[in-house]
Each structure stands twice: as structure tokens, then as C-alpha cells.
Curated annotation (Swiss-Prot):
SUPFAM superfamilies reported for this sequence: TolB, N-terminal domain (SSF52964), Tricorn protease N-terminal domain (SSF69304)
Main location: periplasm
Subunit structure: The Tol-Pal system is composed of five core proteins: the inner membrane proteins TolA, TolQ and TolR, the periplasmic protein TolB and the outer membrane protein Pal. They form a network linking the inner and outer membranes and the peptidoglycan layer.
Signal sequence residues: 1-21
The species this protein was found in: Shewanella loihica (strain ATCC BAA-1088 / PV-4)
Job description of the protein: Part of the Tol-Pal system, which plays a role in outer membrane invagination during cell division and is important for maintaining outer membrane integrity.
Pfam family, one: PD40
Family of the protein in this entry: Belongs to the TolB family.
GO cellular component annotations of the record: periplasmic space
Name of the protein this chain belongs to: Tol-Pal system protein TolB
HAMAP family: TolB
Length: 441
């Protein structure tokens, strides 16, 4: 837990694990209030088994978004339905869903498959009298793509992105990834820096170490991770290319080197250093290693995060007596306090649209994830789990992934930005902590 004593300190081969979910998402709250949608199993037009049912991926994505609730397949009036031309609108007239996703898959060549999918506005179809003048009246989107057998899951995420954006106006985040640290104290090298698809599939290990690894942070282009490693018996900040495995040591000063986070242009890191005594916020140029001190106070300053415009940092400080979140303008150095409610507020990050801040709030001794509207300063506690920490916002600003404790074990969990939808991501072995959600990829 990021208590006052710990948050100032905590801040090789490319191993690919088979395409299964290492982090199984367990939805705990919020599905019943979601928007109903029908996802019809994609029609297979081949003589051998289909490599994977794309509709399964789409259904899981839409459910995990917290926004949609796919209908049970047994409740669909048509299950062998691949296009609008085959749709019996009368059979669908009383179906309580706002849209229908359907498609076909057929062999196209050696390890090639032609996928067609359509998104139908069912509400409009049900309200229309006299039948459509053209298919485009009901057809919200239609795509045709050739993929390989290894791309079925990825293309399912792509379809989910399209459906989500068409129906909500918000870009989908189903093709994103998460980084996190797994700790297995039974292993000789217990610390592993991992990345995986947002839903836990395609888990990959970037680094394994006998010493602690912590605080992973994505670059804006999604190609690099910054993190803290104690592999050399002291805290050091590294930046690693996740594709080439090339690593760059950015800081290795005596004392604390912690909590790195990339600037919006990807050229700098904001981080915490104690090289001059007290932990302070610095900005380091990744290419030149030049550093610039940002804060100068006798209290602890740590956990910096950039505003989307790159002109300010928010950070945690105890300069008011207890940990609270402040904002510092990089040009002037002016510091403004942002949080006042609760006993502690720490670990803040700004939503991509710049309107909200997500952070850890302690009230009555309980650590939970909270969100604050930066214009009205209204604060909402989003979670009811225990010992919550390390919130990270999805790039579309709709969900937050964070660390928590469940049945005595550190796990990851997710909550929607309105607090309505909640899910848990337990892992099979070891503990999982320090999640970081990637940008759009």
C-alpha cells in the first residue's frame, strides 16, 4: 500500500506465452445496467473447423467495456445470420437490443480468411414503417478484410472498436495493452515485468529479476516502457523498447530514482529523485540524460504525472502535512493544491481529455480509487475494494485499471469512470501489481 512510509521509496529473452488469458477477468458489478446488444455468431462458410469464433471476442469485449450487455445466444431470433440481406426484420421486431453485429468467415487462400461483418441499427429498423428504401438506412457499418488464422482475436478486437465508436461516439480501446509486475516469491527470480493484451491474452515477459521491478509507464507511441529496477542493488530508471529489447538507463543517482512517466511528446521523463536530499520532482531528457529540478520543498514530492498538454505536472506532496495532490506549471513553477477531501489523496493522473483526475483517496482509513472533475472539483469514490493503489486510465478515458487486494493477494481490478461497472483480474500464480494501460496502438 502506498502509505507515507512506502510511497516515497516505491514509486531476457522476449518470452511469449500461448494465446490464452493469464489474467481472467471476473465481472463483479454493473452488467445489468448496460445497453443491450445482439452479437450473432459469425457464419462459417468452410468445410473444416473455423480457427476461432470472432463473435466470442466481440461479445467479451463489449461486456468488459461496461457499456454493453450482449444478449444470450439462445435468445437470438436468428442464429444462422451473416448479413442484413438475410435478416428477418419481423422476427427481430420485439428484440430489446439497440444494434446487431453479424458476419461471415470463409477460406480465401493458404492460411487466409475473408471476414465480412455488418453492424445494424436495430432500433431504427424496428421503428421504420414500410420497409427500408436502401440497406444503408439500417446499416451503420460494413467491412471486408482478409486475415490469417493468427489474426482472428486481433480482428475481433478491431470489430469491437468499430462497434463501440459507432454506438457511443467514443473510440474503442480493445486493441490496447497493459503492463504490470508479477511477483512470485516461490521463484528464484520472483519479479517479472509483463505486458499483455488489455484482456490478459498474449502475455509476454519483458524482464525477470531477483530484485524488485516497479512503476512501469508507457511511452505515447506504445513502443517503450519506463520502469524502476533494483537489479543492480539500487533503484535505477530504465527505458526499454518492447520490440527490440534495447534498454537505456536514464537515471542511477544515489537514493531514490522512482515513479517515471513519459511526457506527451515521448522525449522526457518526469520522475522522483532524492539525490540532493529530499525526494523532489525532476524532468529528465531521455536522449541527453540532462535533468531539471521542478520542485524545491522540504516536504516529500513524488508520483508526478503529466497533463495532456505537457505544460504542467501533477504530483503527490505532504507539504500541507498529509499527502495531497498538487499541480505545478513547468514554465512558472507555480504550485496549486488540487485535493482537499479525505485524509490522504495520492497517485493522481489526468484523463486524456483533461477534464478529470483519477487518484487514490484515503477516507476513514480506507484506500479507494476516486475521480475528481477538475472544473467543479466534485470528487466521487469509484471503488469499494480494499487497499487500492496505482490507478491507470484507459486511453479513451472510460475505464481505470488499478491494483487492489482480494482474499489476501494483490490482484488487478478495473472500474468504469462513472463507478458503475467493476471487474477483477485475478492471476493464477503470484501477485500482480503496478498496472499501466497503454496508449492507442
Amino acid at each position: 500500500m502506498k502509505n507515507l512510509g512506502r510511497w516515497l521509496i516505491l514509486g531476457l529473452a522476449f518470452l511469449t506465452i500461448p494465446a490464452k488469458a493469464a489474467l481472467d477477468i471476473v465481472i463483479t458489478e454493473g452488467v445489468d445496467a448496460a445497453r443491450p446488444i445482439a452479437v450473432v455468431p459469425f457464419v462459417w462458410q468452410g468445410s473444416t473447423p473455423m480457427p476461432q469464433q470472432i463473435s466470442d471476442v466481440v461479445m467479451s469485449d463489449l461486456t468488459r467495456s461496461g457499456t454493453f450487455k450482449p444478449m444470450d445466444e439462445l435468445g437470438l431470433p436468428q442464429r444462422n445470420l451473416g448479413s442484413l440481406a438475410q435478416m428477418d426484420l419481423k422476427a427481430w421486431s420485439n428484440v430489446a437490443a439497440e444494434a446487431v453485429v453479424m458476419g461471415t468467415v470463409k477460406p480465401y487462400g493458404p492460411d487466409q480468411y475473408l471476414v465480412n461483418f455488418e453492424l445494424i441499427d436495430l432500433v431504427k429498423a424496428q421503428m421504420q414503417s414500410g420497409g427500408p428504401q436502401s440497406a444503408s438506412e439500417y446499416l451503420l457499418d460494413s467491412r471486408e478484410t482478409v486475415i490469417s488464422s493468427a489474426q482472428f482475436r486481433q480482428y475481433g478486437h478491431r470489430i469491437s472498436d468499430i462497434v463501440y465508436e459507432k454506438l457511443t461516439g467514443i473510440r474503442g480501446a480493445f486493441l490496447t495493452r497493459i503492463a504490470y509486475v508479477v511477483v512470485d516469491h516461490k521463484a528464484k527470480s520472483p519479479y517479472k515485468l509483463m505486458i499483455a493484451d488489455y484482456d490478459g491474452y498474449n502475455e509476454q515477459m519483458l524482464l525477470r529479476s531477483p530484485e524488485p521491478l516497479m512503476s512501469p509507464a508507457w511511452s505515447p507511441d506504445g513502443r517503450r516502457l519506463a520502469y524502476v529496477s533494483f537489479e543492480n542493488k539500487q533503484a535505477e530508471v530504465f527505458v526499454q523498447d518492447i520490440y527490440t529489447q534495447q534498454r537505456t538507463k536514464v537515471t542511477s543517482f544515489p537514493g531514490i530514482n522512482g515513479a517515471p512517466t513519459f511526457s506527451p511528446d515521448g522525449k522526457k521523463l518526469a520522475l522522483t529523485l532524492s539525490k540532493d536530499g529530499q525526494p523532489e520532482i525532476y524532468v529528465a531528457d531521455i536522449a541527453t540524460k540532462a535533468i531539471k529540478r521542478v520542485t524545491n520543498h522540504y516536504a516529500i514530492d513524488t508520483e508526478a504525472s503529466w497533463t495532456p498538454d505537457g505544460k504542467s505536472l501533477i504530483f503527490t506532496s505532504e507539504r500541507g502535512g498529509r499527502p495531497q495532490i498538487y499541480q505545478v506549471a513547468l514554465a512558472s513553477g507555480k504550485v496549486t493544491r488540487l485535493t482537499f477531501e479525505g485524509e490522504w489523496n495520492l497517485g493522481g493522473s489526468i484523463s486524456p481529455d483533461g477534464r478529470s483526475m483519477v487518484f487514490v483517496n484515503r477516507t476513514n482509513g480506507k484506500f479507494n480509487i476516486a475521480r475528481m472533475d477538475l472544473e467543479t472539483r466534485f470528487m466521487q469514490v469509484l471503488t469499494t475494494t480494499r487497499l487500492d493503489e496505482s490507478p491507470s486510465i484507459a486511453p479513451n478515458g472510460t475505464m481505470v485499471i488499478y491494483g487492489t487486494t482480494y482474499q489476501g493477494q494483490q490482484v488487478l481490478a478495473a472500474v468504469s469512470m462513472d463507478g458503475r461497472f467493476k471487474a477483477r483480474l485475478p492471476v493464477g500464480q503470484g501477485e500482480v501489481k503496478s498496472p499501466a494501460w497503454s496508449p492507442f496502438l
